[in-house]
Amino acid sequence: MRITLAVGLCLIACAAVASPRAKDAAKPDNPITAQTRESFRARINENVVTIMAGSASGTDLAIVQDIADVLDDGSALRVLPMVGKGPEQNIKDVLFLRGVDMGITQANILKHYAKTGELGANFIDQVAYIAKLFNEEMHILVRSDVNDIHELQDKPVNFGAEGSGTEITGRLVFEALGIEAREMHLSDADAIQKLKSGEIAASIVVTGKPAPALSNIKDARGLKLLAVPYIKELEDSYYPATLTHDDYPVLVPEGQRVDTVAVCAVLVSFNWNNDSPRYARLEKFVDRFFTNFDAFQKAPRHPKWREVNFAATLEGWHRSPLAQAWIDRAKQAMSTASRDHFDDFVAQASRTSGTPMSDSERADLFRAFLEWTKSHSNN
């Protein structure tokens, strides 16, 4: 027993001696200091911007992912897509939610908040649009025995999730058309099932075509897309649009089309002061976004990019000073290049004719030259 006790005490003593060495071995050679950690945290957050898309099923999430795929290089600029709840909430998130730099909303959101008054009269001064994006078409899925949108008067109609772009646009368009439907708020999948069973009369989907919820329908027997008339009351906020067999092979017969309306999707940000760190990050984003525009026009990017025009204006909205500055610089560069080419052209023309041109002749000729350049660049 004495031998056992001695051995036990020896093992305990060895463990006591070895323990500090084991702890020392576990320590890294170059431990991360608090200062190093803070430096890393600052560096990793320095060039990050976030963009709030709409719901996971909308076209704008694919658009935001395209932006990240093209612009995010992991260090100089990181773009983080975020899944939101739609145009109504996205405006609130851009205004109030920490960490949200930009969001996609719809151009008619101004009319919506003008009606509700929820954000006050001057909220538009706090929001700036970076770019007018693509059109989001209004789809109305009905049973095949419905032939006119006014037949939906007093009928149960699915307007999508509350606060969604579908709900907002659906309400405003129906109001303009003088139609009062019984609003339902269902998912697209549930709405299609209830439409087939006759529990509802129609389901509205507002998103860039092709809408996944509709293009994924396998059995469309008894269903069709309903036309939306483009009346005068819709001209201020909406565009005429069409849905074709190529968009929805099982819902639109070949050779036919369904006329509808579309609302514009808009990329917006908070209207930061130019001394804010957020302003500096947005400036870097805008420069890369606009400069790399051609990359968005090519496969495998979403076909809706072909509708985007960064220089387009939106009535009632304030354009981001960052976006306006980039556009102004681009116009100046184009003008300078055109002027240089034109001066060479005039010099050659003067040498040919042997007679110097007057200022008025140069002005007339320059206007003609710009028109000629524009017509040839569009070919």
Feature locations, PLM:
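Pocket-lining segment of extracytoplasmic ligand-binding domains
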Residues: 107-108, 117-118, 179-277
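Extracytoplasmic
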Residues: 46-48, 58, 74-76, 86-89, ...
